[in-house]
């Protein structure tokens, strides 16, 4: 349903949207691929963090890597970095975070941002800003996870899309508050 609803927003690019096997823009492909992965509950789990890192992180990394023509090594390094950051943050915020928030959606945004920034060959300070920016884009509450409707499946798609936005912006020089994870009014 989402692929049909977003058909006019496909854009152009070399990322593959596995929903239909056609090329699309990076953000379009990542969004739909992450949603599809989570819809069929075909994603991994980091149980200690209550987090499914694969849907948002791998979907973002794969789309960016395909579009940029990145090597398999670059893709692997980006995914590993995205997992490392996402899983560590998920450990730090649980179990209280999951009471109101869907960790895959919130923390997934951070993992996707790191993977994207890595593939864009961002410097360390830019990767830090990608994380900081992504904390402002993180969302996905428990009501839509546990309640009626189809919103749950969109959570990792939004995380992948928002993470890509954060990674691209930071690699392009956009900055954010570097205490956004641990500040009094931060994540």
Label each region the model flagged:
Residues 1-187:
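N-terminal core-entry segment
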């Amino acid at each position: 349903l989402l692929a049909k609803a977003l058909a006019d927003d496909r854009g152009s690019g070399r990322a593959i949207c596995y929903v239909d096997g056609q090329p699309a823009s990076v953000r379009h492909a990542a969004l739909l691929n992450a949603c599809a992965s989570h819809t069929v509950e075909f994603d991994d789990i980091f149980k200690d963090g209550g987090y499914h890192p694969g849907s948002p992180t791998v979907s973002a990394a794969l789309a960016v890597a395909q579009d940029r023509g990145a090597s398999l090594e670059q893709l692997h390094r980006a995914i590993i970095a995205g997992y490392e950051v996402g899983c560590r943050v998920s450990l730090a915020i649980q179990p209280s975070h999951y009471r109101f928030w869907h960790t895959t959606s919130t923390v997934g945004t951070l993992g996707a941002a790191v993977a994207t920034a890595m593939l864009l060959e961002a410097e360390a300070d830019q990767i830090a800003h990608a994380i900081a920016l992504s904390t402002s884009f993180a969302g996905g509450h428990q009501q839509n996870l546990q309640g009626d409707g189809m919103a749950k499946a969109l959570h990792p798609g939004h995380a992948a899309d928002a993470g890509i936005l954060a990674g691209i912006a930071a690699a392009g020089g956009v900055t954010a508050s570097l205490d956004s994870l641990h500040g009094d009014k931060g994540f």
